[in-house]
Structures are given as structure tokens and as C-alpha cells.
């Protein structure tokens, strides 16, 4: 039996509104390919909602790596782990964010997604990305 569809309220819609279709699709592809994803914001609620929304978008798959929507200051060195993760940190840690390597950094306040230099996307993902982008953009007429 399949797990229940995740109940997110308006969290998924808010993620699309904050980041746009293209950036959210980049994040979904990154999560599916086991990349490190780091959200940062001034709002703890926005961090939690965005991390939860991203994992909900993976349905019917489940995210099985490290998931910490709000990383405490005392554990900030965990960001240098080599394993995939989805984590959120308060924006007051800007200095530490500049030192994070091989990580996709998501600025929820500015609506920007920064991909690492070594991040490559395979041709099969380009086709998937383009198709899904067009379906969302033209059939649902959002953003």
C-alpha cells in the first residue's frame, strides 16, 4: 500500500511563490539526485515550511537522508558533512554559508538558488525539467 499523500496546507504553494517554478524544480531534481541543500532565512517558520514542502514534492518517494529544518547554532559545523542533506539555518550565519562547499544554497528571503560550480545536470534531467516546467507554467498558469 502506498503512503498517504503529504498534507502540507499552503506550504508548497508558498515555496513556489518564494522561489518560482524553475528554482523549485532545480531543488526537486537536486533532492532526487542526493545533493546537499541548505535553506537560509530570517524566518524560522519559513525555513520549516520550505524544507517540509520540498520533501512533500518528492512524493511518492521519501527523503531518507539527513533532514534538519532548523539547524542549531551549536551544530553549524555539521554543514561540512559529505552526506546528502536538507537543512535550514538562520540568515545570521551568512559568514558560515560562504564557506560551505558542494552545497545548493537557497535564500528564501531573496528568492535565489545558488548552485555549486561542480553541479552538473544530465541530459535526461534537462528533458524532465523542461517538460515539468511547461506543464506547471501553462496548465496551472501560476507565477
Residue ranges, per PLM feature:
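Acidic, Ser/Thr/Pro/Gly-enriched alpha-helical scaffold modules and adjacent low-complexity linkers
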Residues: 1-143
Amino acid at each position: 500500500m502506498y503512503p498517504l499523500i503529504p498534507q502540507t496546507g499552503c506550504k508548497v504553494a508558498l515555496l513556489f511563490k518564494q522561489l518560482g517554478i524553475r528554482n523549485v524544480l532545480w531543488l526537486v531534481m537536486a533532492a532526487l539526485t542526493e545533493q546537499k541543500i541548505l535553506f537560509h532565512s530570517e524566518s524560522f517558520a519559513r525555513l520549516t515550511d520550505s524544507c517540509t514542502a520540498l520533501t512533500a514534492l518528492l512524493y511518492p518517494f521519501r527523503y531518507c537522508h539527513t533532514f534538519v529544518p532548523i539547524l542549531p547554532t551549536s551544530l553549524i559545523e555539521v554543514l561540512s558533512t559529505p552526506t546528502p542533506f536538507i537543512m535550514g539555518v538562520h540568515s545570521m550565519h551568512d559568514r558560515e554559508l560562504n564557506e560551505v562547499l558542494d552545497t545548493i544554497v537557497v535564500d528564501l528571503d531573496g528568492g535565489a538558488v545558488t548552485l555549486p560550480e561542480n553541479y552538473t545536470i544530465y541530459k535526461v534531467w534537462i528533458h524532465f525539467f523542461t517538460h515539468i516546467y511547461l506543464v506547471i507554467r501553462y496548465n496551472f498558469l501560476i507565477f
